[in-house]
Amino acid sequence: MTGKIFLDGGAGYIGSMLIGYLLDEGYKVTCFDNLLYDKTSLLAYCSHKNFNFIKGDVRNFELLKKEISKHDIIIPFSALVGAPLCEKNPLDAKLVNFEHVKYLAKNKSKDQLLLYNNSNSGLGETDGKSLATEETEFNPISLYGKTKYFGELAVRESENHLVFRLATIFGGSPRPRNDLLVNNLVLRALKDRVLIVYEGHYIRNYLHIRDVCKAFVFALDNWDKCKNEVYNLGNDNLNMSKLDLCKKINEYIPVEIIEAQYTKDLDKRNYKISSQKFYNKGFQCEYSLDDGIKELMQVYKMIDVPQYANY
């Protein structure tokens, strides 16, 4: 498949990586972003003949409507990501995470493709033993989890859609994020040689950012057999506790690991995820946790650490 893609929030952590994959596949990509966090993450694409940038805010619905009408595929990435940031900015969380997505879903044509990313954060707290599938009841706790889930529900009411529920993402990007769990723990290990972990028994599922990008391309290339469904998107080999994650990092960076209940996860994320439904379509993950740790060890030799976080 080729076509014109409208990707909002494309200057962010995943979007700035995904754009390169889409351009390599021959898509024409318009990135719509207000550049809240980073004004340089897209510079490498500016010379590409199929790349276009529009500086704009997704809360400007009239501008959104005008721009999406020119495209075949809509991929909304603009979001206030993470429970802490949404708690600080509840109105913007509702407008950006939910209302703008609902507007896109209602105002696109039936022939336009809409590819949405939700988060598995909405699962809330499970027993951490049984595998959560797409049929497992969603129970979002935080404002972040709720707004992302409401966005998913709006998308599912439209024709020609696909929803991914993303695992915890890790790895380097043109717009790095140091507040993601794996990235942050590698950074802390390198800087402090100590990892202080709370709720260490809590289990999460992880996925390398490049596998996220590959999954989006795969979905577009195989749209007819994938469309109008919800898919967990994670690495089934990476269901692991936070404490085991620290131990894996310790294999590469010698650290002292300390368990301390100094805070709590607002989303109470404790779950094992199965992404078998999407694997059954033919997708395979390529990047391991070891790959990501070694990559991040190189990344953190280069970047200005305090600059790259969402909250």
Label the predicted regions.
Residues A83-H100, A132-P140:
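Short alpha-helical oligomerization interface
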Residues D192-R193, V197-Y311:
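C-terminal substrate-binding subdomain of Rossmann-fold SDR/epimerase-dehydratase oxidoreductases
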